[in-house]
A protein has these predicted regions:
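Enzymes that bind and transform nitrogen-containing heteroaromatic metabolites
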Residues: 1-235
């Protein structure tokens, strides 16, 4: 069993994510338009929401955890912290080295996705911080296992995946996305080097065997467009 996964993202008209690179809007202010995206995200009312590691560390926890003993537990099991919020914040940390200054992001309790080889000292640190965790295979990158555990152990029925492009691309490749909630910012990036909405860094075609069905189109304030698509897995 997996949660319903909605990829909720805002991009420029050329599909780029770096807001600092976007042109200024013709109507309104950039922060106001980004606020529309945030408001739509709250409407989705998912049980949990998720960032990729780079996005989280850049905005919240830039420091790295260091330990001289990298010995893992022989049989690691998921851990649910004693006190958790109604909504959860999920973070994929295949390096098992984020130094957390808080057990929450925007008031939502953190659940870390880790490799089974995570150092025992790091797991002990997370428990002392009141941070829940689960495992995604030996390398920490098996999203299918992670999502199954998130649903079956943590009771998450819906997840809002909010970038960045690398984690979106990984979920796309795994075939785990059920719906795309795409908010189009009325501006352009134009740079070939900017991260795209889906920025898969592996080999092959991550979207192979998948099709999109348009569910709805809404024109929001100041030229913002909200598109919703359903993913279909082609047999």
């Amino acid at each position: 069993m997996y949660p319903q996964i909605i990829c909720h993202v805002m991009g420029s008209v050329d599909g780029r994510l770096l807001t600092d690179h976007w042109t200024e809007p013709f109507n309104g202010k950039k922060n106001e338009l980004i606020g529309i995206y945030a408001a739509i995200g709250r409407k989705l009312n998912a049980d949990a929401w998720m960032f990729g590691k780079h996005t989280l560390c850049e905005g919240y926890f830039p420091k790295t955890f260091h330990t001289g003993d990298s010995t893992p537990l022989a049989h690691p099991v998921p851990y649910i912290a004693g006190s958790t919020s109604e909504h959860l914040f999920v973070i994929a940390d295949p390096d098992a080295n984020i130094l957390y200054e808080s057990s929450t992001v925007r008031g939502n309790s953190i659940v870390a996705i880790l490799p089974e080889t995570a150092p025992a000292f790091y797991l002990e640190y997370l428990q002392k911080k009141g941070i829940s965790y689960l495992f995604a295979g030996t390398k920490g990158d098996n999203l299918n296992i992670a999502m199954q555990t998130l649903a079956e152990t943590f009771g998450v029925e819906s997840l809002s995946l909010q970038g960045g492009g690398i984690i979106d691309g990984a979920f796309l490749q795994a075939g785990l996305i059920d719906e795309l909630s795409l908010v189009i910012y009325p501006g352009i990036d134009g740079s070939a080097n900017s991260t795209s909405i889906f920025h898969y860094i592996g080999k092959g075609n991550p979207s192979q065997g998948q099709s999109l069905e348009l569910l709805s189109v809404q024109t929001m304030e100041n030229g913002v467009i909200w598109l919703r698509y359903k993913f279909h897995k082609n047999s």
